[in-house]
């Protein structure tokens, strides 16, 4: 298509048409610096490839995308690369002397609004799949947080770079992270790719309180506008794809409960804790239960009644009189789980008597040791906490499933790798992902670090046969943005936290899906 200029008369004609929404693609430093002397102040080939891939690729091969840019941005593109091939180049200029006559795939407009009006009308509404605003500074300052901006694809440059052009910070009251890549380093610069999606039309839009979190109530299908290369990067697909694979290809196995499972061995998921919190959204996960159980572990308690009194009943089945008698713990008081997780974390090696005893100063406090090593010897390869104590297994109501955690410090970040010998994909794993992610965030907080990665290694990853149908229902749901979790900055001691110290915002999952626990 030859060059087109949109004038005021055409703008008037298009005023009745709805404007196109758009997505922003930009690379910026922590200070939101984007340029120096009219140029990019970095050389990041991986970022340039990402820019090309996201702006060029369409799901419909008969369509193309549009890239909207200011005149200075156009002129900063090397002549041999302009116009950007395979895309409609929309150049914003009010200069009458700007001449790009006879240039294919280029149109000029006088403003962002006039460009969006043009792209909403024929023929462009039929031929353009997505609209990307790509710069420069003036255009991005106007476009970044407008209601018509659906998403922001931000290359976050973690290293300080001298810039003279800046854009506003992303308004996190209306945008939430959809995906964030793991950091990489190229030409001395550390960076990652993060996509933010609009979840509210404005910061004033109300939210509801639900399940101990602030809920925004948005539809998972709303985010299908994202390029597939971005949509598929949502980390919940790691879990969903694993469940689907186990149901389709798992080994048929018997188990101690007599229920029967489909099982695979040696699976792994890796979650990025830097921007969001991996609380699954394709079904509701009991966040308050996650928090209270972890605090119960940290306290060293083995008394299921402590959780019961708070309305948390996840341990009831393994603490009942019938169950304890059934595994030979006939002398054990109902509710006494024996030397399970919290006892091993805080009193490893101590002799267990019952849930009422005071074990202060007894055994080895692994949690305190982990914190001490993170603070004082962060390069130690022995920053480890184990709940697996063979000499105590016979005394436990249930041997530990999530049994071994190793912590790793680098770049001012704390990461955790946890090994889980037995992984109930339907009920347990969503809880375990959240629990160890929260533990990592807590330890980072008390050690003045920031959360990094949570790597979840699963030994026997299984789906109970009774969970196949509800999990197939869950697989039909599309993910929504993970929530954001913040910790009370006033609390710096691991034993000082209470449930209200954890602020979870933007959690709006699909409905709860019932699954019966196999005991």
Swiss-Prot record:
Matching Gene3D superfamilies: Dihydrofolate Reductase, subunit A, Thymidylate synthase/dCMP hydroxymethylase domain
Region Thymidylate synthase: start-end pairs: 235-519
UniProt keyword Acetylation present: yes
GO-annotated biological processes: 10-formyltetrahydrofolate biosynthetic process; dTMP biosynthetic process; methylation; one-carbon metabolic process
Residues at the active site: 401
Sites where the protein binds dUMP: 256, 402, 420-424, 432, 462-464
GO molecular function list: dihydrofolate reductase activity; thymidylate synthase activity
Catalysed reaction, written as an equation: (6S)-5,6,7,8-tetrahydrofolate + NADP(+) = 7,8-dihydrofolate + NADPH + H(+); dUMP + (6R)-5,10-methylene-5,6,7,8-tetrahydrofolate = 7,8-dihydrofolate + dTMP
Binding site for substrate: 25, 47, 134, 155
Stretches for region Hinge: 201-234
Span of the signal peptide: none
Sequence positions bearing N-acetylalanine: 2
Domain DHFR: 21-198
Alphabetized UniProt keyword annotations: Acetylation, Methyltransferase, Multifunctional enzyme, NADP, Nucleotide biosynthesis, One-carbon metabolism, Oxidoreductase, Transferase
A GO CC term attached to the entry: cytoplasm
EC annotation from Swiss-Prot or TrEMBL: 1.5.1.3, 2.1.1.45
Subunit structure: Heterodimer or homodimer.
Record protein name field: Bifunctional dihydrofolate reductase-thymidylate synthase 1
Natural source organism: Arabidopsis thaliana (Mouse-ear cress)
């Amino acid at each position: 298509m030859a060059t087109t200029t949109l004038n005021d008369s055409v703008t008037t004609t298009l005023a009745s048409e709805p404007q196109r929404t758009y997505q922003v693609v930009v690379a910026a430093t922590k200070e939101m610096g984007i340029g120096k002397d009219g140029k990019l102040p970095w050389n990041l080939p991986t970022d340039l490839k990402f820019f090309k891939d996201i702006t060029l690729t369409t799901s419909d091969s008969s369509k193309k995308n549009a890239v909207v840019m200011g005149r200075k941005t156009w002129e900063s593109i090397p002549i041999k690369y302009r116009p950007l091939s395979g895309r409609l180049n929309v150049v914003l200029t009010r200069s009458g002397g700007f001449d790009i006559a006879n240039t294919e795939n280029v149109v000029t407009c006088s403003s962002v609004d006039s460009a969006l009006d043009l792209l909403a009308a024929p023929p462009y509404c039929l031929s353009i799949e997505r609209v990307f605003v790509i710069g420069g500074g003036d255009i991005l300052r106007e476009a970044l947080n407008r209601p018509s901006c659906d998403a922001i694809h931000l290359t976050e440059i973690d290293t300080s770079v001298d810039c003279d052009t800046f854009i506003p910070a992303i308004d996190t009251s209306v945008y939430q992270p959809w995906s964030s890549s793991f950091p990489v380093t190229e030409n001395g610069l550390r960076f990652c790719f993060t996509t933010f999606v609009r979840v509210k039309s404005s910061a004033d839009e109300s939210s509801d309180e639900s399940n101990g979190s602030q809920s925004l109530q948005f539809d998972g299908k709303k985010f299908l506008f994202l390029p597939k290369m971005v949509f598929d990067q949502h980390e919940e697909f790691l879990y969903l794809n694993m469940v689907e694979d186990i149901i389709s290809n798992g080994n048929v196995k018997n188990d101690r409960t007599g229920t029967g499972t489909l099982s695979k061995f040696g699976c792994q998921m890796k979650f990025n804790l830097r921007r969001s919190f991996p609380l699954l959204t394709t079904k509701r996960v009991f966040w308050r239960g996650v928090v209270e159980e972890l605090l119960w572990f940290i306290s060293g308690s083995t008394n299921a009644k402590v959780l019961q009194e708070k309305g948390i009943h996840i341990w009831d089945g393994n603490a009942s009189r019938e169950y304890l008698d059934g595994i030979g713990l006939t002398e054990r008081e109902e509710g006494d789980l024996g030397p399970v997780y919290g006892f091993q974390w805080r009193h490893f090696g101590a002799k267990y008597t019952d849930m009422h005893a005071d074990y202060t100063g007894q055994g080895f406090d692994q949690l305190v040791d982990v914190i001490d090593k993170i603070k004082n010897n962060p390069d130690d390869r022995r920053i480890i906490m184990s709940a697996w104590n063979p000499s105590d297994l016979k005394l436990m109501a249930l041997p530990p499933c999530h049994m071994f955690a190793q912590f790793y410090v680098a770049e001012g970040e704390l990461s955790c790798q946890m090994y889980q010998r037995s992984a109930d994909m339907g009920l347990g794993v969503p809880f375990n992902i959240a629990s160890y992610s929260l533990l990592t965030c807590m330890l980072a907080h008390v050690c003045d670090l920031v959360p990094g990665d949570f790597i979840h290694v699963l030994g026997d990853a299984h789906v109970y046969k009774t969970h196949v149908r509800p999990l197939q229902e869950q697989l039909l749901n599309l993910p929504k943005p993970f929530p954001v979790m913040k910790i009370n900055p006033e609390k710096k001691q691991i034993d000082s936290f209470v449930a209200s110290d954890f602020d979870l915002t933007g959690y709006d999952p699909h409905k709860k899906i019932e699954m019966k626990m196999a005991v």
